[in-house]
């Protein structure tokens, strides 16, 4: 028996299928060990003619449906029934695979006896792909000890006998999310599920005019698939507690990432009864005991979806978005919420950390100014206080910066270097946090991972003079989590900055090892017996110009003892 059957459903794929076929022809794996099964859904272009050109390069099976099925399910089923490989790999016609995919997968499967193998995906042309389950290669994972439930597309490798023996095929009557039902069935029936993440093996490509994805799918059709998945989980040959946990995790996924997320705030009011009825049919298939296992903020949504109560369902989603509730209190760090008069209290709802976006970050040798916004926070403005926290990497020292400006939930903090420079030498690295306080509860969030474009090149720094010593302050983004931190270290001025006279009344400061930013404005140079005023301007990231109010002689230039900017003095002698 050959090792693999690569299954490719096609429909009007002439513009991009060559890339896939080339990737299959270039496989670093014996051509006798895999077949390519192409089933065409009545293309009206040159798709099949292009495929036929690969007869001598690939072990091809090609067929065409008599009538267009309107979705990839039927072509995949026809191909699966034809498959002779020990394993099948489903590949969409607009995607392609790494030349080592089949070779590495075969070796991994032989070693670990996998029934389902997830291979690491990479998005191309802005295509989003699941990533969280591909952090590392794992010979065996489950639906509960991994993130595989968050990838239910069929683009994986399956043991053919697993699918055929358990009658796992794509439901052809369903035109939306049918692949999720297929993949969940495979997960539930597999003896071993594995993840191969050594490299990118599957390239998912964003194309224009994709086949089935843009067609309208009614709420009834969509939620019927979700209901069938719930039923499939509940009917699995597993312990009840285990099934309930899997179903709860599926609900977490569904309400977080599917079209259900925020639907009552997006769908037209006149269409919402149709949606809640279909969603309610799905949720009514979920036993109420499972509600206790889902993310706590979903429990009110499950309650009102099961009751098909669109008005209160909408109130919950709107309340979460605004962070405003009919009644609420916080007990032991959790929310107790009543969403409407006469409605039940929902207790013990976790307060998720807010997401913080750094919308601005500017600095010079005088101050650091950063602006932050809070996103997706369950508590509305007016119920919490914010402050910036600088915490030393060794966690021995902490500095707090109060809020300077609140402009429509845009929080600005001014870190005055004159106020904190005496504390900075105590530690080289200072991490930046936003603290959000609600009563006695404090939430701490690192800053910088989400941000607008950073205005400086890497290593751009500020020059600070403290107790006759010079230091540089360098903001940077951490390697692992891409958050902003401040690096503070002593330097030798002559190794870092050059100072030259240009003409008779301009002084040019140039960074030698990196760019240095200075506060623009009034400045002065102090000689042994004179002081000359000037205007400092940043002409580039590593060059500063001081335009003096009068000429200075070269011999006097060599005797400058101090340089004063608006808020910093640099002793040069």
UniProtKB/Swiss-Prot annotation:
Signal sequence, renumbered to the chain: none
Pathway entry: Cell wall biogenesis; poly(ribitol phosphate) teichoic acid biosynthesis
GO molecular function, one term: hexosyltransferase activity
Outcome of swapping residue 178 to A: Loss of activity
Catalytic activity: 4-O-[(D-ribitylphospho)(n)-di{(2R)-glycerylphospho}]-N-acetyl-beta-D-mannosaminyl-(1->4)-N-acetyl-alpha-D-glucosaminyl di-trans,octa-cis-undecaprenyl diphosphate + n UDP-N-acetyl-alpha-D-glucosamine = 4-O-([2-N-acetyl-beta-D-glucosaminyl-1-D-ribitylphospho](n)-di{[2R]-1-glycerylphospho})-N-acetyl-beta-D-mannosaminyl-(1->4)-N-acetyl-alpha-D-glucosaminyl di-trans,octa-cis-undecaprenyl diphosphate + n UDP + n H(+)
Domain of life, source organism: Bacteria
UniProt effect for mutating residue 213 to A: Severe decrease in activity
Cofactor(s) listed in the protein's UniProt record: Mn(2+)
EC number: 2.4.1.355
Result of altering residue 207 to A: Severe decrease in activity
GO biological process terms held by the UniProt record: cell wall organization; response to antibiotic; teichoic acid biosynthetic process
Binding site for Mn(2+): 94
Family (UniProt): Belongs to the glycosyltransferase 2 family.
The name this protein goes by in its record: Poly(ribitol-phosphate) beta-N-acetylglucosaminyltransferase TarS
Organism, as annotated: Staphylococcus aureus (strain Mu50 / ATCC 700699)
Lineage: Bacteria, Bacillati, Bacillota, Bacilli, Bacillales
């Amino acid at each position: 028996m050959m090792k693999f059957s690569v299954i490719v459903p096609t429909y009007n794929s002439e513009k991009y299928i060559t890339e896939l076929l080339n990737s299959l022809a270039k496989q670093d794996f014996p051509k006798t060990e895999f077949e390519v099964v192409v089933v065409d859904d009545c293309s009206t272009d040159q798709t099949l003619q292009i495929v036929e050109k690969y007869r001598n390069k690939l072990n091809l099976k090609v067929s065409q449906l008599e009538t267009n099925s309107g979705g990839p399910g039927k072509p995949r089923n026809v191909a699966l029934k034809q498959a002779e490989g020990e394993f099948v790999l489903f590949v969409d016609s607009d995607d392609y695979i790494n030349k080592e995919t089949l070779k590495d997968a075969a070796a991994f499967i032989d070693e670990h006896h996998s029934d389902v193998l997830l291979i690491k995906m990479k998005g191309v042309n802005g295509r989003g792909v699941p990533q969280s389950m591909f952090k590392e290669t794992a010979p065996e994972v489950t639906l509960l000890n991994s993130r595989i439930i968050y990838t239910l597309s069929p683009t994986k490798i399956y043991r053919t006998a697993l699918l055929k023996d358990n009658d796992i095929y794509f439901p052809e009557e369903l035109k939306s999310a049918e692949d999720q039902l297929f993949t969940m069935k495979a997960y539930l029936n597999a003896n071993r599920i594995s993840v191969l993440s050594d490299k990118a093996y599957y390239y998912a490509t964003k194309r224009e005019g994709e086949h089935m994805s843009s067609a309208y799918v009614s709420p009834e059709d969509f939620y019927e698939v979700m209901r069938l998945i719930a039923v499939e989980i509940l009917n699995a040959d597993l312990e009840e507690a285990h099934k309930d946990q899997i179903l709860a995790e599926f609900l977490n996924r569904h309400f977080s990432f599917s079209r259900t997320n925020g639907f009552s705030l997006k769908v037209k009011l006149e269409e919402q009864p149709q949606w809640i009825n279909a969603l309610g049919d799905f949720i009514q298939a979920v036993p109420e005991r499972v509600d206790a296992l889902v993310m706590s903020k979903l429990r009110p949504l499950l309650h009102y979806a099961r009751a098909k109560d669109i008005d209160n369902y909408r109130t919950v989603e709107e309340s979460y978005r605004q962070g405003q509730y009919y009644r609420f209190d916080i007990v032991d760090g959790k929310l107790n919420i009543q969403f409407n008069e006469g409605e039940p209290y929902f207790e013990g709802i976790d307060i998720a950390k807010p997401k913080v976006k750094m919308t601005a970050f500017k600095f010079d040798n005088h101050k650091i100014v950063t602006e932050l916004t809070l996103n997706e926070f369950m508590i509305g403005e007016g119920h919490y206080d914010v402050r910036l926290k600088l915490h030393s990497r060794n966690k021995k020292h902490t500095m707090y910066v109060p809020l300077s400006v609140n402009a429509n939930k845009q929080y600005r903090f001014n870190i005055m270097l004159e106020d904190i420079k005496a504390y900075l030498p105590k530690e080289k690295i200072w991490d930046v946090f936003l603290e959000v306080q609600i009563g006695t509860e404090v939430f701490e969030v690192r800053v910088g991972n989400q941000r607008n474009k950073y205005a400086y090149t890497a290593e751009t720094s500020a020059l600070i003079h403290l107790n006759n010593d010079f230091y540089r302050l360098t903001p940077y983004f951490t390697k692992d989590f891409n958050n902003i931190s401040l690096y503070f270290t002593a330097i030798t001025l002559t190794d870092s900055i050059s100072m030259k006279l240009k003409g008779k009344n301009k002084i040019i400061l140039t960074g030698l090892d990196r760019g240095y930013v200075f506060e623009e404005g009034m400045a002065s140079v102090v000689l042994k017996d004179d002081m000359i005023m000037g205007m400092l301007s940043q002409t580039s990231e590593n060059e500063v110009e001081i335009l003096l109010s009068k000429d200075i002689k070269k011999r006097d230039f060599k005797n400058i003892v101090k340089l004063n900017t608006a808020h910093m003095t640099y002793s040069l002698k």
